[in-house]
Curated annotation (Swiss-Prot):
Disulfide bonds: none annotated. It is an enzyme of class 6 (ligase). This is Glycine--tRNA ligase beta subunit. The gene is glyS. It comes from Aquifex aeolicus (strain VF5). NCBIfam families: glyS.
Length: 664
């Protein structure tokens, strides 16, 4: 079990975003063959490295059963082999002595049982290595040889493979593995030999490559901390920038630069976005205001020339941004609204102007629920997409919403209206905040509801991992808003705006799957129980009911409630629809008592299924003393309807038939 394997796939510079996902995929795929106890990955822009230790590599013996024809086909009435059996033996190069008669579900069959020696895990890897590399799910793949078959995210230039200190022969196209790697593109010359996996990190560091992602990240974070102290502020940069920059360099060198204070006229988020978007620079702030400093991370040893180059390129970007900003401020946002008729939302859905028309109808339905000021909401709806026509957003589309807020505020629009223009895109993820203002909440919901309805009606439905229009994000955004804001919203109310369309059931199922994902921390049976009763189009009811049912499930009394509910459910025909109970037909005392108790509970506002526990006594008494399936059809149907009413009471909280009670 002391076997160890090191594989390094050397490439041209990989996009930062593909490195970690590719390593995760390769790790899982290769370790499914090796089953190693220790696994470690390393990744830089020029290499994907995997290390496996402590795995078995024996060739294992196993029995292989080759099934033949049924016994009565293989032998005649006298027990002699038939032509069918002879053909089976010839095909498998076997003798009559090897034949066994074994039982299957459909009777007795002849079979040949042989001992087979399986390939070792390493042999399997050698056999499957090329296919594994070809199966890595990159967003885009490229070819660099005459072979149309060999593709990867970027050209593969070398493969290092060591198994227990010896070169392991692996192939990818015409490329063969060796014990050679390469150091830093600029700071190291020629091949680097690795003879022992234990020397891998140390040797690469000597050649200006830090293969460990976390170590490079820590160097960048320390550089940010040191630079913050130097400039007297703290770092200010978009989420994910540290991780992205970490995968852009093999050896991080910090470069602290400065820009002209005149650019601080720009809104802070514009500066940090320009710096991060174009150059992957980090900015700094103090007391909520940006400082005119930035930190760049170079993949080469820093000098004054590199610093000046960084400052020059950022200055050019900020100069452009300042020009766009000043030009945009000259245009009243309202004057841009008619221009939205020329901005296509989607060929099958219409223009942005048409989208705002639909959003206004949605907002009108939402307004009473949130007690909004309609004039504010209406103004926000019609201003919501105009910043798409500004020069700043054309250049940096990630600033949409924010620039609407900035320009609206600068032009004297109502503060809540201005803020709503930014909040319409909240939350951008499940971790992101929801809108604070009422107007922003309505605008955000209107935008996301329209996205779902419009694209599903157009047949533009997410498939697999593909979601080009961010519909999963829209759905999660709606779910989180109604959850955080406690909005008892029925999304089906907006269907009339879009009319009938055949994809509507797919929209309902789509929301159901998003709710299941949102509620993944809760037991599956409880989530399923609620979704069997409440429509996914009522996300607040679903979420609230799951939480109520889950809290109740912690009680020692909960199994008794479930038992009572299931006892009722089991006896009711699945297609039973009648809830009407004729009191005159209740001839037994136990059924009269159950009916009386039932009506008491039906008139209560129940907050927990545990409140139904007292009903169990009457349910048990009913089943012990009353014959449900009475010979008289009217009496029988009346009793079933009574039980249907009882079941319906339990269904206030979910379908108890789905609840699994764990013993002990």
């Amino acid at each position: 079990m002391t076997n160890e394997l090191l594989i390094e796939i050397g490439t041209e510079e990989l996009p930062a975003g593909v490195i970690n996902p590719a390593l995760d995929y390769l790790k899982d795929k290769i370790n499914s063959l090796l089953n190693a106890r220790q696994v470690k990955t390393y990744g830089t822009p020029r290499r994907l490295t995997l290390y496996f230790k402590d795995f078995e590599n024996e060739r294992k013996e196993k029995k292989e059963v080759i099934w033949g024809p049924p016994k009565n086909v293989a032998y005649d009435e006298k027990g002699n082999p038939t032509k069918a059996l002879e053909g089976f033996l010839k095909k498998n190069n076997a003798s009559l002595e090897e034949v066994k008669v074994l039982k299957k579900d459909k009777g007795e069959y002849v079979a040949i049982v042989r001992k087979v020696i399986e390939k070792s895990p390493i042999e399997k890897l050698q056999e499957e290595f090329e296919e594994i590399l070809l199966s890595v799910p990159f967003p885009k793949r490229m070819r660099w040889t005459s072979s149309k078959r060999i593709t990867f995210s970027r050209p593969v230039r070398w493969i290092l493979a060591l198994f227990n200190g010896q070169v392991l022969k692996l192939r990818f196209g015409e490329l063969e593995s060796s014990n050679k790697t390469y150091g830093h593109r600029f700071l190291s010359k020629g091949e680097v030999t690795i003879n022992n996996p234990a020397d891998y990190e140390k040797t690469l560091k000597e050649h200006y490559v830090i293969p460990d992602f976390n170590e490079r990240k820590e160097i960048i974070l320390r550089a940010l901390e040191k630079s913050s102290q130097e400039v007297g502020g703290k770092p200010s940069y978009p989420e994910g920038l540290v991780e992205e920059v970490t995968n852009l360099v093999e050896y991080p060198f910090p470069v602290l630069g400065k820009f002209d204070e005149k650019y601080l006229e720009l809104p802070p988020l514009v500066i940090t976005t320009v710096a991060a978007h174009h150059q992957r620079f980090f900015c700094f702030e103090k007391d909520g205001k940006l400082l005119n400093y930035f930190l760049g991370i170079s993949n080469n040893k820093p000098n004054e020339k590199i610093k000046e180059g960084y400052e020059k390129v950022l200055r050019a970007r900020l100069e452009d941004a300042l020009f766009f900003y000043r030009e945009d401020l000259k245009k009243d946002l309202k004057s841009l609204i008619p221009e939205l008729k020329k901005v296509l939302f989607h060929p099958k859905v219409g223009s942005m102007y048409e989208k705002e028309e639909r959003m206004e109808k949605i907002a009108q339905k939402l307004c009473p629920l949130l007690k909004c000021e309609w004039e504010k909401v209406k103004e926000a709806v019609w201003l919501s997409k105009v910043d798409l026509l500004t020069e700043m957003v054309k250049e940096l589309d990630e600033l949409q919403g924010y620039m609407g807020y900035v320009y609206a505020k600068a032009q004297g629009y109502d503060e809540e209206v201005a803020k709503a223009l930014w909040e319409q895109y909240f939350p951008r993820s499940l971790e992101d905040k929801v809108p604070e203002t009422t107007t922003g909440t309505i605008l955000s919901l209107s935008d996301k509801i329209d996205n779902l309805y419009s694209f599903f009606k157009a047949g533009e439905i997410p498939k697999g991992s593909s979601d080009p229009y961010g519909l999963r994000r829209s759905a999660f955004g709606i779910i989180k808003i109604v959850d955080v804001k406690n909005l008892d919203l029925n999304l089906e109310d907006f269907k009339e705006i879009y009319g009938e369309f055949k994809q509507y059931p797919k929209l309902v199922e789509f929301l159901k799957q998003r709710l299941i994902s949102y509620l993944e921390d809760y037991p599956v049976d409880i989530v399923r129980a609620v979704l069997n009763v409440y429509s996914p189009m009522e996300p607040y009811k679903v979420i609230n009911s799951v939480r109520v049912l889950y809290e109740a499930s912690k009680s020692p009394e909960f199994p008794s409630v479930v038992e009572a509910a299931k006892r009722v459910i089991r006896i009711i025909p699945k297609d039973w629809k009648n809830y009407e109970v004729d009191e005159k037909l209740l001839s037994e005392e136990a059924e009269r008592e159950l009916y009386q108790k039932l009506t008491e509970f039906e008139n209560k506002e129940l907050k927990s299924p545990l409140e139904l526990l007292p009903l169990k006594e009457y349910i048990d008494k009913f089943f012990d003393n009353v014959k449900v399936m009475a010979e008289d059809e009217k009496i029988r149907n009346n009793r079933i309807s009574l039980l249907k009413r009882v079941e319906n009471l339990f269904r206030t909280f979910g379908d108890f038939n789905e609840i699994v009670i764990k013993e002990g």
